[in-house]
Design a protein with these regions (language model features):
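Acidic, surface-exposed loops and disordered segments
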Residues: 1-164
Length: 164
């Protein structure tokens, strides 16, 4: 095992992969790192999808603006979150709402509450939930001599359809 700072220094975005399969015990440890990460308000409203199926990886590559490297990865780990929570439905004393009112200001939250596309608001509100576990997953992968790349451009609605 590497020291933490060595793992951090070695982490890189990689878009070309060996075809070697990732052993299940390694994959399970990488996923455990994501599960052990903190979540805002201990919401734990994130989950991970492990994709090995070639057809599904190809569909995800298309949903990501035809980034073909995605389809060549031996495994794609999808970082997912529930978007059931709508800030419009939260009580005024909800801790997350109070924190974000302090962070962004009441005018911003009022604007978000009036925004007609509630699905877009929910996506924005819950967007960060899988990011911390995602970084834990990346660092655990590096510790096993693996790497990958964040997918920044992604049609999340289409990806959700593919993964379901």
């Amino acid at each position: 095992m590497m020291e933490l700072m060595d793992v951090i220094r070695k982490r890189r975005s990689v878009r070309s992969f060996r075809s070697d399969p990732i052993p299940d015990h390694v994959l399970l440890e990488i996923l455990e790192a994501g599960q052990l990460s903190p979540s805002g308000g201990n919401g734990q409203n994130r989950y991970f999808g492990v994709v090995k199926d070639e057809r599904i990886k190809e569909e995800l590559a298309k949903a990501a603006g035809n980034q073909e490297w995605i389809a060549t990865a031996p495994v794609v780990i999808a970082y997912c979150t529930s978007i059931d929570v709508d800030l419009k439905d939260l009580p005024k004393d909800n801790f997350g709402l109070v924190v974000n009112k302090d962070r962004f200001g009441e005018d911003f939250l009022d604007y978000m509450n009036q925004y007609p596309d509630r699905r877009a608001v929910k996506k924005l509100w819950n967007n960060a939930n899988p990011l911390i576990p995602g970084q834990h997953i990346f660092l655990a992968a590096v510790n096993h001599g693996l790497s990958g790349c964040w997918i920044g451009h992604l049609d999340t609605d289409r990806a959700g359809e593919i993964l379901n």
